[in-house]
């Protein structure tokens, strides 16, 4: 099954009203339509590796609102993150509809992750003070933006040209769901995790 198909199926089963695939490639649009998505032909000037997700979302939003009227929320899933489930999407939509937030991101909880940064050859601790190391239970809850999906109101995108704005919230996911596919090694790892945690449940 194509990688794109997993994301489309997650969105449809998770309760997304309308699912669109935006691309300048006919082959990708054909796959999207095969699995139940509608197509939006993306202009060449906002396609390719240099294009931002925001530019694609803005174009798609203008097309959709021009054809169908105002949109309440935008869900932007990452196709290379196949380890999410329809329940994760459903949970995200539920949080969005609570009207407590203006933008949301899927996340994994960062437990026992102490991050260091190399600044011009000098190592600096990023998310804790190594000179005042705290007990695990005393550390504030920290989140990893796992990129699986984002939810935001259209006005946030229009005003900020950014997926984030207003009051920002999170949709927590299990840690193993944060992995994405960018290499052959990633593909092997995600395949193993999917077989162990997702396909075994079906």
Name each region found by the language model:
Residues 21-23, 151, 181:
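Short beta-strand scaffold positions
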Residues 170-172, 177-202:
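Hydrophobic helical membrane-anchoring modules
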